[in-house]
């Protein structure tokens, strides 16, 4: 069972995907002071992976970030997740090493 981030829920920043009345996945969009937004997720229940839920959550997150007037949406992707983000229109900007291992900082431009 997924644990949804209570502070982000209270701030209205969480998008939840329901499947048969249960939370099957979620994504968080956090606006930044520099006019960009950070994408946290998507997180999808493992038994529902590869069913399009992650893509739907990212599409909703893009629309939400645009409604917040963010010019760019940023995501941190593990090597395994990087192809998924590329399919969602993100491009790698740089590689960094975190306590969880290497990640690609990826960007999707929202406003021309």
Segments the model singles out, each with a brief description of its role:
Residues 1-40, 45, 58-59:
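Acetyl-CoA-dependent GNAT
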Residues 26, 51-58, 104-111:
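Accessory recognition modules or surfaces
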Residues 26, 48, 84-85, 90:
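Conserved hydrophobic/aromatic "anchor" residues
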Residues 32-34, 47, 80-82, 111:
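Short coil/turn motifs at secondary-structure junctions
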Residues 44, 50-63, 87:
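Conserved acetyl-CoA-binding loop-helix of GNAT-fold acetyltransferases
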Residues 54, 58, 79-83, 97-104:
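Short glycine/proline-centered loop/turn elements that form peptide/ligand docking sites
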Residues 65-78:
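Conserved GNAT acetyl-CoA-binding A-motif
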Residues 74-76, 91-108:
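Conserved catalytic-core motifs of GNAT/GCN5-like acyltransferases
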């Amino acid at each position: 069972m997924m644990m949804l981030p209570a502070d982000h829920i209270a701030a209205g920043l969480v998008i939840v995907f329901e499947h048969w009345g249960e939370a099957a996945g979620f994504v968080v969009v956090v606006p930044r002071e520099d006019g960009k937004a950070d994408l946290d997720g998507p997180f999808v229940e493992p038994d529902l992976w590869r069913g399009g839920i992650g893509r739907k959550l990212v599409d909703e997150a893009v629309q939400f970030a645009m409604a917040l007037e963010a010019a760019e949406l940023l995501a941190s992707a593990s090597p395994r997740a990087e192809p998924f983000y590329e399919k969602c229109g993100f491009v790698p900007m740089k590689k960094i090493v975190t306590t969880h291992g290497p990640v690609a900082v990826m960007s999707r431009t929202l406003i021309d």
